[in-house]
């Protein structure tokens, strides 16, 4: 007898995390949610695809109470995530988009981050008004104007891999995947090349609060997070003041001098805009590129397919984003009672939408666990959907496109040179190290 999803009128059983198996007298717990949200679980095991698969079948809207974290409903089906995401008036972002430990929440609430107002934590109508400040810069036409810069970055990085002999070893995650989007974003925001290491360090610290290698150092974690927030604020404040006094033709100036309803964008909103554009824009693309290369190493026939058919590059980009799902989840808070996936959700409940699970949903994707760059129907949620669809999606796509094309033309062969290492993070997921060996062809004019 197959497991039966918990219906509406048995929601109290769902809150006790029970699902019924072959015997009604032996309820078996699926999960308390720890494997879904613990940064260290992701570092050790990677994304929990086996557990997500089970949840999608047995308990697609699953109540979780992981020790040390706030309780939440785990949403694992593609259709349910779309339903929630397209009702921003019922499921809001303002209370927060991540699941935090009590200590993390206390540290963030007492740091400079508490004052920053980031666009992904705004709700309509404010969100739409603030989004319009930068949206003209991220249209497909505007981003295509950056193709030359993206192609230059890709060419220079692959040239660096080639060296004098064309053969070598590298850590693709740090040497290429990290560097490429950083250069593109620095160009857009007018950040000097010499300041890029500081941006990278702070971005790593922001998205890897629990990673022993990347996190801000210090025994007092609350103090470390406070210092991180202050340093980010001071760095962006300098850029904002400069662009207000000396505006240029760049995104930094547009944000620094942005207006909403005829009024200047507030300082905290402006700093928050910088924070999300630079940190999220860099980290997500970096993780897609690193995870994409890992996928190509594990599925060399797909790399050969791209090399033989470069016209598939746009589909390849979409498949890499589906496969890697760099933004693993987003949290929403219900502001009224609702029913999702047959479960009663109460006003005030937290819902965590796991995009990594939705992107392997067999009800949406044919052969979801197969990496294939010629996938035609690919309605993945790697960039989200609805009100908060990724503002920088066009940039992320074109940036990845440039690098995959350059590599497909010049990479003769590549293989793993060691074990990849996962970032200690459950929110933005990916590889911090990907050792590989390779042979690169010389560039052609």
Regions found by a protein language model. Name each.
Residues 3, 7-445:
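Cytochrome P450
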């Amino acid at each position: 007898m197959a497991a039966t999803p918990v219906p509406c009128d048995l929601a109290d059983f769902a809150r006790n995390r029970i699902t019924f198996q072959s015997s009604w007298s032996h309820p078996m717990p699926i999960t308390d949610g720890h494997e879904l949200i613990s940064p260290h679980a992701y570092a050790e095991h990677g994304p929990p695809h086996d557990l997500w698969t089970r949840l999608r079948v047995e308990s697609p809207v699953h109540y979780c109470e992981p020790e040390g974290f706030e309780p939440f409903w785990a949403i694992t089906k593609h259709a349910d995530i779309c339903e929630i995401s397209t009702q921003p008036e019922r499921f809001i972002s303002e209370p927060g988009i991540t699941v935090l430990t009590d200590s993390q929440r206390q540290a963030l609430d007492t740091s400079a981050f508490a004052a920053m107002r980031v666009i992904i934590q705004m709700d309509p109508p404010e969100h739409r008004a603030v989004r319009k400040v930068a949206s003209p810069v991220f249209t497909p036409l505007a981003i295509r104007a950056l193709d030359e810069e993206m192609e230059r970055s890709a060419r220079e990085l692959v040239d660096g891999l080639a060296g004098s002999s064309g053969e070598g070893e590298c850590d693709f995650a740090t040497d290429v995947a990290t560097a490429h989007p950083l250069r593109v974003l620095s160009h857009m925001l007018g950040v000097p090349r010499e300041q890029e290491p500081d941006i990278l360090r702070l971005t790593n610290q922001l998205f890897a609060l629990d990673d022993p290698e990347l996190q801000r150092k210090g025994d007092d974690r609350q103090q470390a997070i406070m210092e991180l927030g202050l340093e980010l604020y001071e760095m962006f404040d300098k850029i904002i003041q400069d662009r207000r006094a000396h505006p240029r033709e760049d995104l930094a100036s547009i944000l620094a001098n942005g207006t909403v309803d005829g009024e200047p964008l507030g300082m905290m909103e402006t700093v928050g805009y910088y924070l999300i554009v630079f940190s999220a824009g860099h980290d997500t693309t970096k993780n897609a590129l690193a995870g994409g290369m890992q996928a190509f190493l594990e599925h060399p026939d797909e790399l050969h397919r791209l090399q033989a058919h470069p016209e598939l590059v746009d589909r390849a980009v979409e498949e890499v984003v589906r496969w890697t799902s760099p933004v693993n989840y987003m949290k929403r808070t219900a502001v009224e009672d609702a029913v999702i996936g047959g479960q009663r959700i109460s006003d005030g409940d937290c819902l965590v939408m796991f995009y990594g699970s939705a992107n392997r949903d067999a009800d949406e994707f044919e052969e979801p666990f197969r990496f294939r760059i010629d996938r035609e129907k690919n309605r993945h949620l790697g960039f989200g959907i609805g009100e908060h669809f990724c503002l920088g999606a066009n940039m992320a796509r074109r940036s990845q496109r440039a690098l995959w094309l350059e590599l497909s033309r010049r990479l003769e062969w590549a293989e793993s040179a060691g074990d990849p290492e996962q970032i200690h993070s459950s929110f933005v997921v990916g590889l911090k190290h990907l050792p590989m060996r390779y042979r690169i062809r010389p560039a052609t004019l």
